[in-house]
Regions:
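C-terminal helix-rich "cap/oligomerization" subdomain common to oxidoreductases
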Residues: 7, 65-70, 214, 272-303
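Beta-loop-alpha module in the N-terminal Rossmann-like domain of NAD(P)-dependent dehydrogenases
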Residues: 16, 46-108
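Hydrophobic residues in well-ordered beta-strands that form the structural core
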Residues: 52, 91, 116-118, 246
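NAD(P)-dinucleotide binding in Rossmann-like oxidoreductases
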Residues: 199-204, 215-272, 282
Length: 303
């Protein structure tokens, strides 16, 4: 049995607490959050332990697996601690907000042979797996990705790395996955589309991103935090005489639901695959996607 701890206890983060209890070879033994009320309530809810001292949990040799589901600004801190103690790590995207420190972090992870997974769970969504299978013998020419939500909280967006690192990350990864390729040209338009509130915080509320991939597939992304319908997530794949629309693979009742409902199955499947592996999962993909995010942001600042 792999004894585990979840770091960060927001509503969405608690999905991991439930999933650790569902997987046959894992158990939830500790939860941790800097917020005393959150950690005490979660410990009571999930019938596990907690502590006001994170180092105390780290020093417990029985706790092998740590899930980092805390705010993005804290990922680097917890990663460094967990690498030091040679723990197994499941980290929500992104790895770090500091591009200059990404290489050194990854170098430490690999040199110490840390088993780690970056939570690119959208790849494990039933709908997207079905779409991926449908294009196995087809040539995709254009991919259109839309992600629009009603979350206009500037503080939360900045804390999570901004529009592209927070909202775009999963979709940049999915585009590479569907295209079986990497982008070679990126053009981002965000300044003229975004609200003043976001711009004055060096962030964007809306953006259009166009990419040309190395295999000549064109990908168009539309991102927005101002959608009154709720969470709108659509992926369309176009080729000669075919179009595959993600809406056809979701129940109508959940099309505009939040991602934790629409892709609930994917969280469990990604974590489950990782714990049964004897090696890291999606680390290189996470590194690559983080660098794509940086390029998208660079393009936004000059256009």
């Amino acid at each position: 049995m792999i004894k585990s701890c979840v770091i960060g206890l927001s509503k969405n983060s608690q999905i991991y607490c439930n999933n650790l209890k569902k997987i046959k070879i894992t158990s939830l033994n500790f939860v941790y959050d800097k917020d005393q009320t959150l950690r005490n309530n979660a410990a009571k809810k999930f019938k596990c332990q907690t502590s006001n001292n994170f180092e105390e949990i780290l020093r417990n040799k029985e706790i092998e697996l740590f899930i980092i589901a805390s705010p993005t600004t804290t990922h680097e801190y917890y990663l460094n601690k967990l690498i030091q103690y040679k723990k197994i790590i499941y980290c929500e995207k992104p790895i770090s907000l500091n591009a200059s420190k990404l290489n050194s972090l990854v170098k430490r992870i690999k040199s110490k042979k840390i088993k780690i997974c970056i939570g690119l769970n959208r790849r494990f969504s039933d709908a997207y797996i079905k779409m991926k299978k449908l294009i196995k013998n087809k040539k995709v020419k254009i991919i259109q990705i839309t992600s629009r939500s009603s979350n206009a909280d500037v503080t939360q967006s900045v804390r999570n790395g901004g529009l592209f690192m927070d909202k775009g990350f999963h979709f940049f990864d999915l585009a590479c996955w569907f295209a079986n390729s990497l982008p070679k040209k990126i053009i981002t338009i965000a300044n003229p589309l975004s609200t003043k509130e976001f711009l004055k915080n060096n962030d964007y509320s809306d953006a259009v991103v166009n990419m040309k991939f190395k295999n000549n597939i064109i990908v168009e992304y539309i991102f927005s935090r101002n959608n009154i319908l709720g969470h709108e997530e659509k992926i369309k794949l176009f080729g000669n005489k075919f179009k595959i629309d993600s809406d056809k693979f979701f129940k109508k009742s959940i099309i505009y639901k939040n991602f934790d409902i629409k892709h609930k199955d994917s969280y469990l499947k990604c974590l489950e695959k990782f714990v049964y592996l004897n090696k890291s999962l999606l680390l290189n993909e996470g590194i690559r996607t983080q660098r794509i995010c940086d390029e998208v942001l660079r393009s936004a600042r000059i256009n």
